[in-house]
Amino acid sequence: PPRSTLFPYTTLFRSGELKEEEISWWQDLWYEGMGEFRYLNGLLGVSKESWVSFSYKKESEKKLHDFSKLSGNLIAFTGGKDSSLSLSILKDEIPESETFSINPPENIEKIRNFFGFGDRPSIIISRKMGYFILSANEKGALNGHTPFSAIVAMIGMFVASLRDKKYVIVSNEGSADEETVFGTGINHQYSKSLIFEKKFREYCNLVWENGPEYFSLLRPLTEIGIFKMFKKYEDILPEISSCNKKEKQGTWCGKCGKCLFAFLVFSAVWDIKFAKKITGKDMLSDTGNLNLLKELAGVSPT
């Protein structure tokens, strides 16, 4: 990659030995997981082998956790519509279920209470972006999506081992398997895809035996199907946001692709009046959203 990125060229593991299959897995994750980054920054010609390398230094051998007493579910909960739907589906298994959240919205307990999880453990994880990344962006460093959902998966497996939970449940749906860059096979949400899920499960089986199992509960569903299932949960919808910029406050910026997409589906499943009520915006009347609309419709580059 060009030197205008902060992405590391090599990563050194200091505990234990890396098998060839593990090295291949990590290379695959960071190459495929940054597919949109490579596309947007003109780096599609860079090979997987030269994108990043992994090595190890066997300084210590770590003893793995005892997985003989695993039971119950650990649910990744963001406070958004997808993970909220998972709570609604799993509410009857509450005694065996806990949630974990990374930088959750301020109203997350209100949503958990609505779905009957108020008296169940909630593990809160704080994650901060390094200041040098933000300053590098301001100076023109290349930017783009990273495989964040893979980070969520790893954190989930770690927390599950600490909490002795058998299943790590996420809420990735079917559209993560559809390419967003025509003819390339690239989806910016690679680490939400079924192929990643399968490879991650294979990786976990490679490095430990009988550990927690990772899977997505909503894989068979489409986006519009998820919205339709929320018909019976309209009372909580004003508390749920899918906006990356305003999700912390549980509101909508009305200027990003996620906001506009949600507005369109709210309009399709309910009506445009309902979409305005939930988001507090009239996004289709905002001419500043025209390019976003073209991207969502597939008539301009992502």
What are these model-predicted stretches?
Residues 1-3:
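Short, well-ordered junction/capping motifs at the entry into regular secondary structure
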